[in-house]
């Protein structure tokens, strides 16, 4: 990477790292795992910077794949008790609609109930504000798969106990 490319890469990281971290935190519910996934994503981007035409799309795809792969690997390992945090982490969720301190744990708990694939689609589509086509491209699946998976995931979220009372049953009739 030459100096000009290096400056362009640094500018990209400066403008996008918070967005990537916010998506990763929503996908993982864990700040440290999210930081790690973003770091690995940016490492992969740096290695291919001169060949990547659409760095935002590349990062979305790599980040999502890393988070899904990590979740699958974690599901195969025995669970460990998390260590208590020794320092406060900055809040990457403070810049979006999850500002409500009371609502944030409920939303993260509900997202935890989804499969990694469902969660990635919901986070990219509704929290990342990407179109079905962009999510489809990021995950390498058909647009119809994104729509049907999002529909099933949202139906599951509507019935999640931590979100009880946030949805009006009359607005979402049973099928």
Language-model segments: what does each one mean?
Residues 1-22, 32-35, 50:
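A short, charge-rich alpha-helical start-of-domain segment used by transcription regulators
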Residues 2-3, 7-8, 154-175:
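C-terminal edge and immediately downstream basic/flexible tail or linker adjoining helix-turn-helix-like DNA-binding
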Residues 17, 21, 42, 115, ...:
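C-terminal flanking helix
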Residues 36-43, 53-65, 148:
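Structural recognition of an alpha-helix C-terminal capping motif at a helix-to-coil junction
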Residues 54, 64, 68, 139-164:
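DNA-recognition helix of helix-turn-helix
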Residues 64-83, 99-100:
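Arg/Lys-rich amphipathic alpha helix in sigma70-family domain 2
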Residues 121-125:
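A short pre-motif secondary-structure segment
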């Amino acid at each position: 990477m030459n100096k000009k490319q290096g400056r362009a890469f640094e500018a990209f990281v400066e403008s996008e790292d918070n967005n990537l971290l916010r998506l990763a935190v929503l996908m993982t519910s864990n700040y440290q795992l999210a930081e790690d996934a973003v770091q690995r994503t940016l490492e992969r981007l740096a290695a291919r910077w001169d060949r990547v035409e659409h760095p935002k799309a590349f990062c979305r795809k790599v980040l999502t794949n890393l988070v899904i792969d990590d979740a699958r690997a974690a599901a195969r390992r025995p669970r460990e008790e998390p260590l208590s945090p020794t320092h406060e982490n900055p809040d990457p969720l403070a810049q979006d609609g999850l500002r409500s301190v009371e609502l944030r744990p409920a939303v993260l708990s509900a997202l935890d109930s989804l499969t990694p694939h469902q969660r990635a689609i919901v986070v990219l589509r509704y929290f990342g504000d990407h179109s079905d086509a962009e999510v489809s491209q990021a995950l390498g699946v058909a647009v119809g798969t994104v729509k049907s998976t999002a529909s099933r995931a949202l139906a599951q979220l509507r019935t999640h106990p931590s979100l009880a009372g946030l949805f009006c049953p009359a607005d979402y009739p049973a099928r």
